[in-house]
Amino acid sequence: MGVVTLQGYIVVPDTDLASVQDVLLEHIELTQREHGCLHFTVSQDTENKNRFNVHEKFVNRAAFEAHQRRAKDSRWVHIAANIERHYQISEDS
């Protein structure tokens, strides 16, 4: 099992934009502290305020799945329930 990379973007509806921005930093900080997280960034697009570019790297599939489980129990998942997710996930061999 190799490094798992998630790349893509999310689109946040206008109605949720302020709430997402309020909890995003906490979500980033919690994720960056997770065992196995190599890289985690979410940055607002410079041309589209509703688009946030996402780049994640975890040491392996187990670390990536642990992140997914942790995020499901966080404030982030409730605030971000209405966002559109556009991701590509790859795994190095």
Please report, for each region that a protein language model flagged, where it lies by residue.
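Short, well-ordered beta-strand segments in beta-rich or mixed alpha/beta enzyme
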Residues: 4-10, 41-68
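Short, surface-exposed ligand-recognition loops at beta-strand->loop->(often short) alpha-helix junctions
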Residues: 11-17
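Generic structural signal for individual residues within well-ordered alpha-helical segments
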Residues: 18-21, 65
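Short, conserved structural micro-motifs that define repeat-unit consensus positions
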Residues: 27, 37-40
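Structural motif
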Residues: 29-32, 44
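An amphipathic, aromatic/His-enriched active-site/gating alpha helix that lines ligand/cofactor pockets
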Residues: 32-38, 57-90
